[in-house]
Amino acid sequence: DGTPTPLGEETVVVRISDHGELGMSHGGLRQKAFNVYEESIRVPMIFSNPLLFPRGGSSPHPASLLDLLPTLASLLDVEPPPGLRGTDLSPLLRDPGAGPVQESVMFTFDDMHAGTGKVREVVPAAGRIRCIRESRFKYARYFHAEGSFPAEAEMYDLAEDPHELENLAHPGHPRFGDPEVAAQRERLMARLAEAEDRLARPLPN
């Protein structure tokens, strides 16, 4: 009935989702896989507790589902296990107006059948995706470990192009050779490579 209880005051409730839905965006795409568009990878992450967070708020800064465990450990004053991946988001929960606790998050996708031709009716797409997402920019590379699918890349300026219609990583884009765009692209490629070395461990083929 909505009446506060001691259990409610002692419980942190987290509402999340594992993926979004394309909903016919980007020219009629459906489902949620084989892409890094915001409709697919941007999901809610809501923390609720009347004592810890008496006032509502939201933050635009990057966060990942990997951050869930270290954040809960911090809120509960529990020492996280060594080597735990993810970032503590509790500073943002306590002060939504605070600056970012991390500059970017990485998204990965692995499908063991796409592009192999070994399974009937499989999606003819890259089996692996690696993406770096910052507050403003997003860069992704699509590839297949066995080289059966041509490598492709996407880059979007989410401030100027929130619907992700202008792929600045496509050689045919009129701004592809723009020095500022090229510099951002090289920076994002380097950041993604560093994140892959640090975080991503591909599944075996």
Annotate the PLM regions.
Residues 1-55, 64, 120:
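Histidine-centered active-site microenvironments of extracellular/periplasmic hydrolases
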Residues 35-41, 48, 109-170:
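C-terminal, low-complexity/hydrophilic appendages and adjacent surface loops
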Residues 17-20, 29, 85, 199-205:
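Short, solvent-exposed turn/loop segments enriched in Gly/Ser/Thr/Pro and often Arg
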Residues 25, 91, 167-170:
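Phosphate-coordinating loops and pocket residues in cytosolic domains that bind phosphorylated ligands
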Residues 3-14, 55-130, 183-187, 204-205:
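Polar, surface-exposed loop/tail segments
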Residues 30-32, 59, 170-175:
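Short glycine-enriched, charge-decorated loop/helix-capping segments at active-site entrances
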Residues 168-205:
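Long, internal low-complexity/basic segments
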